[in-house]
Amino acid sequence: MTNRTLSREEIRKLDRDLRILVATNGTLTRVLNVVANEEIVVDIINQQLLDVAPKIPELENLKIGRILQRDILLKGQKSGILFVAAESLIVIDLLPTAITTYLTKTHHPIGEIMAASRIETYKEDAQVWIGDLPCWLADYGYWDLPKRAVGRRYRIIAGGQPVIITTEYFLRSVFQDTPREELDRCQYSNDIDTRSGDRFVLHGRVFKNL
């Protein structure tokens, strides 16, 4: 199946907690702590340093250097419930050394690290859609998850350049309500609008061609 961008009206039909998470412009982990009513822990599934940036529109024609690719899970510390899966591409050569060290040596959430650094950043409006979960979840043993999730993608800008591209997948099954069934029955488009003037096509995992 492909992915379909959600309109504002369709987003309003999501469960209240899911709407809060999708709309938050702050640190997702902090908000999820409140929504889930428990401490949230970060489980880094995969982290690797790429010498060459992937060929995606968000990074096109930019001399950005090395990329840190990070795939994580956000889970309840006590319950073990998986709430969110996330993928990030981080342009580490455009960030202060201290941030790079925290990213590579600790399990702290990216949002927490960036907030603590106090560097000036701007988060672009996120694009929200319903679509498939990333394929790497199955690769690491998560076979029994729902096939569809609410996803969002955004870029974080610092110094006039994108330094982080994050894609988050919210597991609908862990929230009380779900969007109306017609959301999954509508005509799908696998074009994703980044709201930065770029459009690109998703095929399975967002960064499958890395």
UniProtKB/Swiss-Prot annotation:
UniProt KW Cytoplasm keyword: no
UniProt-listed Enzyme Commission number(s): 4.1.3.40
One function term, GO molecular function aspect: chorismate lyase activity
Function noted in UniProt: Removes the pyruvyl group from chorismate to provide 4-hydroxybenzoate (4HB). Involved in the synthesis of glycosylated p-hydroxybenzoic acid methyl esters (p-HBADs) and phenolic glycolipids (PGL) that play important roles in the pathogenesis of mycobacterial infections.
Broad enzyme group: lyase
Keyword vocabulary terms for this entry: Lyase
Catalysis: reaction(s): chorismate = 4-hydroxybenzoate + pyruvate
Family to which the UniProt record says this protein belongs: Belongs to the chorismate pyruvate-lyase type 2 family.
Keyword Signal: no
Transmembrane portions of the chain: none
Name assigned to this protein: Chorismate pyruvate-lyase
InterPro entries for the chain: Chorismate_lyase_/UTRA_dom_sf, Rv2949c-like
